[in-house]
């Protein structure tokens, strides 16, 4: 695209040496410019062979550095493990007995009980008793509840309970690929997502995370993906090549910048690799399954460049010998097998204590190319601090189990 006089003026206005706008206007400017770029160019094709949103993402990062660097969200008190501005963070506590470790499940129940009109549930599995009971209560008080699930778990107790009260449940009916999401959309206003399946094991025995984000634009993304699965029975890819998730780049009410991608159409692994390239000081990760060559290579490259790279792997997922654990161990990175007698189920990367990668997305080719998955990249020091605490806790247990 030729650079016209008007386009030079536009770029100059963005990146030229001008007096800084007042702080309260920075987020608004970033949002307006980003949305304008998306509106102008996502209608068709790609630029210089770039994958789906890569070129937009490049502009996003330039704008972020120029206009609005990551800032810590203010601390709050209403989240169980951490209320960091617009994002509430939760973790499981498998070191405690179930009757003392149910905070994350009770949090989900609280959000379900507060739902007034619509509730869309994408559940890889559903057998957690109190979450199921809350969903049934929602149906009985008139909330429209819809559900998509993985075919392999269509007969779980929670799915049967929903069907018994008239909820329509759609399963993916695919062999060799999974509907692996674990998210809920509340009243088209807020989203719950993370690594935790809505099960007894995941809530009480496995290491997991969940985030609650009240944002209508993010909810629109998840509602769009849900509709593709529930209404069009389209799992994995988008229904059509022209279909898009509406808000891949967004800014929350507290200024937190978020990227949001889904498998397979958004190629989340590419976005993970590109984000890893931003690392200057540290990369900390917790990985249930980690076999993706591109992601592991990006981490090893950063290690070679002097960035501290450290992580914990779920031990049962290394048995086949294909895990990135062995390559990293051979390169003498401080990586460990987890110490939970059950499963360490996180899928988390923390970069420079500023950027968090989180969601249902395991670091594997299947997650990127076959499954239905969701991924968030969150630029917020406060949220990263909460996940860093969890990383250090899991790392300590792993070190003690593997002296």
Name each region found by the language model.
Residues 180:
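Active-site microenvironments of hydrolase-like enzyme catalytic domains
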Residues 2-171, 177, 185-403:
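Charged, low-complexity intrinsically disordered terminal segments
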